[in-house]
Amino acid sequence: MIAEIADILGDICLLIFVFALIYAICSSVVSDETLYDRTLLASTDPRKLEYFIEPSHDEQPQLFPTIFDEPEVYATFVVPAYNEERRIPSMLNETLQFLDTRRDENPNFSYEIIVVDDGSKDKTAEVVLDFANSHPEIRLLKQPVNMGKGAAVAAGCSHARGQYILMVDADGATKIDEFNELEKKMLQLQQVNREAIVVGSRAHLEGQDKANRTPIRKFLGLSFHLLILLSGVRGINDTQCGFKLFSREASRYLFPNQHIERWCFDPELLVIGRKRKMQIAEVPVEWNEIEGSKMKVTSMIKMAIDLLRIALFHGMGIWTVKLKQAVYDQELI
């Protein structure tokens, strides 16, 4: 009886996989257009990634530099934010306290925080600008429409001034002082290759969570890990933790070549990194689940489809990896 049920479940999974693959193929434009290529759209197109704001005396938007410019600070902290007016103040306060302490201990340490407001409908932008008025290290990159977390991270990292770029979630689920551990690993990796990625990982916490998982959650978890493997990611146990450190050299290839704009962009970055033979490592981090951070079932379905797109389009060579400095220079002259 159990064997029959297992066979039925296997057939169902296979059907879901086939239909999802067909849907992904049919619903996607099969081209090598990346997120940054959209900056070449007309200025009236709301998807255009050219909405950069920072406090200034004349209160006019300021154009950010690009990842292809020389670094101006040691580290950039990119914070994607969508409707985060309530949670982001505590996260920014904690981050500023940590970074200012680092700077007091080492005068050569410099930083910036780029908050990417991804088309928020609340007062996220106003809250961030209030912080920026008293903390010039904070800058706001504002997108007029919601494009997704992946697009927000790509926009922020594409215009970072740091030698090292940390992606960190606005909910503060991962303590900011974990940056020190990722930084240590990054410096080790760069002795081999300047293009490097360090992934914050919650995999060591899985044992604590498994006891509370329902059979459905266990099934979904196993299915997701299978799709991660199919997408081409190997050797990384936790691809989805919102705490990742990138070298500037790696970022010049990662974000200009990114296609996935919503939740499942992380595996694509790792696939791009593997294609470039970057140094990639995983470091355990302290992580606490924050209220309001649960993912919807519809988002999980979309993630599965995006993973199939990554596997198919990168696997077939439709999505390529190349240096796109000319695109940046043309756009920003």
From Swiss-Prot:
<dbReference type="GO" id="GO:0005789">
    <property type="term" value="C:endoplasmic reticulum membrane"/>
</dbReference>
<keyword id="KW-0472">Membrane</keyword>
<keyword id="KW-0256">Endoplasmic reticulum</keyword>
<comment type="similarity">
    <text>Belongs to the glycosyltransferase 2 family.</text>
</comment>
<comment type="function">
    <text>Dolichyl-phosphate beta-glucosyltransferase involved in the glycosylation of glycoproteins through the synthesis of dolichyl beta-D-glucosyl phosphate which serves as a sugar donor for transfer of three glucose residues to the Man-9-GlcNAc-2-PP-dolichol precursor to N-glycans.</text>
</comment>
<dbReference type="InterPro" id="IPR035518">
    <property type="entry name" value="DPG_synthase"/>
</dbReference>
<keyword id="KW-0808">Transferase</keyword>
<protein>
    <recommendedName>
        <fullName>Dolichyl-phosphate beta-glucosyltransferase ALG5B</fullName>
        <ecNumber>2.4.1.117</ecNumber>
    </recommendedName>
</protein>
<feature type="transmembrane region" description="Helical">
    <location>
        <begin position="5"/>
        <end position="25"/>
    </location>
</feature>
<keyword id="KW-1133">Transmembrane helix</keyword>
<dbReference type="GO" id="GO:0004581">
    <property type="term" value="F:dolichyl-phosphate beta-glucosyltransferase activity"/>
</dbReference>
<keyword id="KW-0812">Transmembrane</keyword>
<dbReference type="GO" id="GO:0006487">
    <property type="term" value="P:protein N-linked glycosylation"/>
</dbReference>
<dbReference type="InterPro" id="IPR001173">
    <property type="entry name" value="Glyco_trans_2-like"/>
</dbReference>
<feature type="topological domain" description="Lumenal">
    <location>
        <begin position="1"/>
        <end position="4"/>
    </location>
</feature>
<dbReference type="InterPro" id="IPR029044">
    <property type="entry name" value="Nucleotide-diphossugar_trans"/>
</dbReference>
<comment type="pathway">
    <text>Protein modification; protein glycosylation.</text>
</comment>
<feature type="topological domain" description="Cytoplasmic">
    <location>
        <begin position="26"/>
        <end position="333"/>
    </location>
</feature>
<keyword id="KW-0735">Signal-anchor</keyword>
<dbReference type="Pfam" id="PF00535">
    <property type="entry name" value="Glycos_transf_2"/>
</dbReference>
<keyword id="KW-0328">Glycosyltransferase</keyword>
